[in-house]
Swiss-Prot record:
CC terms in the record's Gene Ontology section: cuticular plate; cytosol; dendriole; dendrite; gap junction; nucleus; parallel fiber to Purkinje cell synapse; stereocilium
Summary of the tissues where the protein is detected: Brain.
Gene that encodes the chain: CALB2
The name this protein goes by in its record: Calretinin
Residues the record lists as Phosphotyrosine modifications: 214
Assigned keywords, A-Z: Calcium, Cell projection, Metal-binding, Phosphoprotein, Repeat, Synapse
Binding site for Ca(2+) 4: 164, 166, 168, 170, 175
Gene3D superfamilies in the record: EF-hand (1.10.238.10)
Source organism: Homo sapiens (Human)
Amino acid sequence: MAGPQQQPPYLHLAELTASQFLEIWKHFDADGNGYIEGKELENFFQELEKARKGSGMMSKSDNFGEKMKEFMQKYDKNSDGKIEMAELAQILPTEENFLLCFRQHVGSSAEFMEAWRKYDTDRSGYIEANELKGFLSDLLKKANRPYDEPKLQEYTQTILRMFDLNGDGKLGLSEMSRLLPVQENFLLKFQGMKLTSEEFNAIFTFYDKDRSGYIDEHELDALLKDLYEKNKKEMNIQQLTNYRKSVMSLAEAGKLYRKDLEIVLCSEPPM
């Protein structure tokens, strides 16, 4: 874990590049689990306070515990005591805050799924490096943010290094969805009840009564209700409507095909 005796990189800078931000993240996420938590979180705040005071950026409150509590109340949206990478980007002075750029233009689950549908061009269940580059380029244009080819390449590689949890050079849907605010990330709701390929095939076949290879939104409603009841999880009408809308963003002309739903509900995307 990062200790006070080991100076973390770049915290004193007035503005961070995307690459520098990533180095800070890796420094404090010592166990590499995708969160800064526990002692890691305490170390981060101690070092951030030191760096800001050293560079003349005094905090409003000198009370470490109070400041840390305020931060967690503001950014720890699901109150799990952990800080995610995209949340950290909101307090560090990151150049052209590229993570927030995602959130401004892919702010809801439905918009995110529409973007995923566009850039997962081969419908593999992954966005690969060349597809991600196009995704980022379009987002930067939407945000009217100037960029050049080297900067676009840096953003692409940084996002890959941030969210490519298994190091295969491509992003699965669940990995990419970490760009969404926690409260908008409907995919988190399916954690702990992912299906195997065999389980998915059985449930899809049950609801695809006419064996057409796709289901409509009403059949999806029934499928989601069944899935939640099976896993003893509660879901109200509004949640069901939101989840259905998000998943149906993957559909073509109201038809949700087996392969697209499998990306959302299975442990691994289809090969």
